[in-house]
Amino acid sequence: RLAVAAGRRLDDAQPWVDGQLSGVGSGRFTVRLHAVLPPVAAAGTCLSLRVLRPATQDLAALAVAGAITPEAARLLADVITARLAFLVSGGTGAGKTTLLSAALGAVAPHERIVCVEDAPELAPPHPHLVRLVARTANVEGVGEITVRQLVRQALRMRPDRIVVGEVRGAEVVDLLAALNTGHDGGAGTVHANSPEEVPARLEALAALGGLDRAALHSQLAAAVQVLLHVSRGGDGRRRLSEIALLHRDDTGRVSALPAWHVDRGEQRGYQPLLQVIRDRCGR
């Protein structure tokens, strides 16, 4: 019944399903559904449900909760004011969407933000927000609307900032292209265990869209300036743990230059990041 409610098929011929249940909790939540039937699931039917609560907190609320330090909050506010493009990296459940939504809430109210998502999670406290949500194919296998298609549609909606809730496929090619066509200040999230791993992760995703390594690094260097890395500690606390500046070396490769760490404070990339901010703001 859950599979049918998600518009998907689950039977002996199709023994697994991956879908979304909308309208849960009086329409407040979306639930991601994954199920596998035996004999593929050897011990019996395996069902996984993940509740996606709208991310509505602002930076002040995250600071009160201890998820972001005052110093990091000020630096992030400067990044947003300077319209630097940024990616939020981290593992599953580390708080990437929560931080991204809070950061978008700090964008000037006159700016138009167009968010493209695989599932409706981003709900930043911002008055000029347009949300586009992808759709899976129905039981007949038709009607799919991909994130990549929606990124292209977003370009036609006069956005001041384009945001992709989660970059996990070939849509990275279209996002980077969009950010390189005059749409400064864009953002997104990506799965990675550290800021240093983000370029390699984007290489793999770009390959799905037919973009080779050299082209990816060229596009990335021009499109994205900052990485925000979130982590989840052994006590379950989620926090912004690192800020890095993306820079291109003499070989043409993009790497992450550490700028700030939650335990170690300012890093060697801190002053270069401040200089980029000053240059953008004309200071």
Region locations from a protein language model:
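Hydrophobic anchor at the beta1->P-loop junction of P-loop NTPases
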Residues: V88
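Walker A (P-loop) ATP-phosphate-binding motif of ABC ATPase nucleotide-binding domains
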Residues: A85
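Conserved P-loop NTPase nucleotide-binding/switch module
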Residues: E117, L122-P127, A154-R248
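Walker A (P-loop) phosphate-binding loop of P-loop NTPases
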Residues: G93
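NTP-binding/hydrolysis catalytic cores, primarily Walker-type P-loop NTPases
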Residues: Q219, G234-R283
